[in-house]
Amino acid sequence: MASTTVAQLAAELSRSAAALLEQLQAAGVGKATPEDIITESDKTRLLDYLKRSHGQADDSARKKITLTKRETSEIRQSDATGKTRTVQVEVRKKRVLIKRDDAAPEHQADGAEAQAHVVDAAEEARREEEERRQAEQLARQEAEAKAAREAAEREEAERRARQEALEAEQRRQAELAARKAEEEAAASRAVTEANEDTSRKKAEDEKARVAAERAEAQKAADEAKAAADKARAEQEIAARKRREAAEAEARAIQQMLNAPARVLKAPSERKAEEKKAEQTGTLHKPVKPAGTEAKPGEKKPVTATATTTTDKKGKVVKAGTSSTWQDEGSRKKGSGLKTRGDSSGGVGGWRGGPRGRGGRQQQHDDSRSNFQAPTEPVVREVHVPETISVADLAHKMAVKASEVIKQMMKLGQMVTINQVLDQETAMIVVEEMGHKAYAAKLDDPEALLVVDGEEHEDAELLPRPPVVTVMGHVDHGKTSLLDYIRRTKVAAGEAGGITQHIGAYHVETDRGVITFLDTPGHEAFTAMRARGAKATDIVILVVAADDGVMPQTKEAIAHAKAAGVPIVVAINKVDKPEANPDRVKQELVAEQVVPEEYGGDSPFVPVSAKTGAGIEDLLEQVSLQAEVLELKAPVDAPAKGLVVEAQLDKGKGPIATILVSSGTLKRGDVVLAGSAYGRVRAMLDENGKATKEAGPSIPVEIQGLSEVPAAGEEVLVLPDERKAREIALFRQGKFRDVKLAKQQAAKLENMLEQMTEGEVQTLPLIVKADVQGSQEALVQSLQKLSTAEVRVQIVHGGVGGISESDVNLATASKAVIIGFNVRADAGARKLAEHNGIDIRYYNIIYDAVDEIKAAMSGMLAPEKRETTTGTVEVRQVFRVPKVGAVAGCMVTDGVVKRNSLVRVLRNNVVIHDGELDSLKRFKDDVKEVKQGFECGLSIKNFNDVQEGDQLEVYEITEVARTL
């Protein structure tokens, strides 16, 4: 028996010798080196130790080893629907091995051997039975595979046979057609030749009948040719029909042959396909057969394709698609996916039937034809507003927004779904997509106002008082004249004795009620006077007899003529010694205002607001003009009017002075004035007394509006507050874009001006006034002060007192706050004092304009002026080391000061312009040298001084500029 070393045993066990030595020592076998001899007893001890350490203490247990072998293959088969499936075939082989223990005691050997024989016999029988079953299964699988291969080979052979038969039939038909054509051509040639021979013989034999025979021969030839052509045409039609039938059969065969072959796929590809199938669809539709195509006689839709082909994978591919994008929707509906809009009753539709029908219903649906009748494209009439988003345009055309975006891309414009298109672009897109585009009118809720106004046109018209506007130049006595009429002293209460608001009053005279509007005469209130002329029936033009026609008088005449109202001229201040009414008449005639005594239509009335002379005549002329005009207005109707003035009161809120033009305004009515609306909470007359209603030509002051309306806005009474709010919000949004566009344009213009003209001084201002008319006039007057060097910037303009928000805005913009007839509250004053904000209060408009003009003058760059102070003649030149040229001079005129500017003249030509460096008399430095004295001087950075040169000494002074 060969001896075994520790190293050899370690090599057999595929272990390292060191690890085996450790295990031997742990088992109690004394081996120290790999060269030591190991015996069978040592191996047994090692085995026992290993069994104990691994948890197997019972040696009597027999070991049983089971071997399982698996073989996997794939077979591709087609089911009844034509879909190809992959079938996995797995073959399992199982084998059990039992290891006997030869080291058992001898007295157990016989029993163990007998038991082993019994076990081996049973195991052998079981293994034989299992091998037999596996052999049968393998044989059955091989038979199935062989049958599948034979079926495929048979199909291939049949396909080849059909293809060859088809080709042979085509060749035979072509040869037959060619042969028939040749035979017919030969027959026709033979007939023609025979006819020619006959005619030639007859021409030689019988010359008399040549013409007749030739005609008959020609007729026979024509008939033969027509018959031949007819036969040829019939043959061509038959050949074309046969060719089309053969091509259709060939396409069907080609489509069948292009079905996927039954090949084995790798498991990874099969898993990927299964995963893709789980992700993409739930229903399957078979490929549409060629026979279901539309017939030539049927009407095809515009977007239908011409041909249908299949790719290598058997999927339907459109060849020759139309140029429109609308094919995608039909292709999506034709796919096997569930789509919410598919209500055609097709197989793939979500409305195809109830869910509980089972597999039979699905199989029946799969066998149903997929052909859908073509439909005509729907042409819609799309009304396109001024602006419309892409999503809204798609909704109007009943298409997806992506279709509109694609069409815009085709037109060369990249848009998003929320991008706004202008009307012209949107109409082009609509027409490109096959619909009809119409320019729609803006959905204007103000159209409701016209309808409401028409409902009350049939109201009874009653006489109304005239509205008389008093206009004229400043300080010509308009308000004083009105005071005498009203028997009040309004003029004494105006700041500076000038009118700065529109005052509306109604006066009861002996000749009826007259409503007066007193307008300011200062040049800044142009817009106010224009509004006064717009609301009036008659204009009283007040001209001072001692002053004559002035600029604002001419402007008032222009406003009155623009409004188309008659003018009554009141020549005021006739009680003054220097009054000259005739000169006033001549000046007014030059302005196209001709008095009645000169043949005109304007009555001239000399009056005196101080003594009251001529007032009655003036009122009589006004009444006569009113009678001529026949002023009437409905009384029992919703009120309409005009905003004469508006302001913001700290306690009452927005307040508007309204002149009612028609209807009756009552407390509690819902009014709309521009973008402001609200319910009339309180109504006061011009004396501050509460009133419940106001009829035509009556001025009132109302409270309860949502904001301060713009002066000159039309006032309407609406039936409910909801409609008023809707129209007001519409008006606010309608002009917001225009306002922003103007602001942006102004910013751009300012930026360009600053870039081109350099840095411009800016005076930022915040203007707050008591009424809107004054604020408007003040802002316009201040903006007129802007020049190319200093510009007035109105940061904010508003109505009402100066608040803390105004001070904060002034702090941020470094602006000066101007308060016109308003004051700052305590919080605003404290905040302004803390932040160093300048707040200026004014009561007279030209005081504010003058002070701002003075401030702007201070911001102007000072003007530099040059003044010659003396003249020096160079008598001698000295060269001093380290100093340069020193000129000995005589002051011939004026005085020379140290550090003065100097010009060097040689032959009356300036050769240098610089500054004196030093000035001495003898050896002493002096500050100045007067005329007639000698001095020595040196010029900074100039040494080319020569005898006979003239030095001109001058200085530059800065002079403040004014606007």
From Swiss-Prot:
Domain tr-type G: 463-632
Pfam families (alphabetical): EF-G_D2, GTP_EFTU, GTP_EFTU_D2, IF-2, IF2_assoc, IF2_N
Region (G3): 518-521
Residue segments, region G4: 572-575
Stretches for region G1: 472-479
Region (G5): 608-610
Main location: cytoplasm
Function according to Swiss-Prot or TrEMBL: One of the essential components for the initiation of protein synthesis. Protects formylmethionyl-tRNA from spontaneous hydrolysis and promotes its binding to the 30S ribosomal subunits. Also involved in the hydrolysis of GTP during the formation of the 70S ribosomal complex.
Protein's UniProt name: Translation initiation factor IF-2
Originating organism: Cupriavidus taiwanensis (strain DSM 17343 / BCRC 17206 / CCUG 44338 / CIP 107171 / LMG 19424 / R1) (Ralstonia taiwanensis (strain LMG 19424))
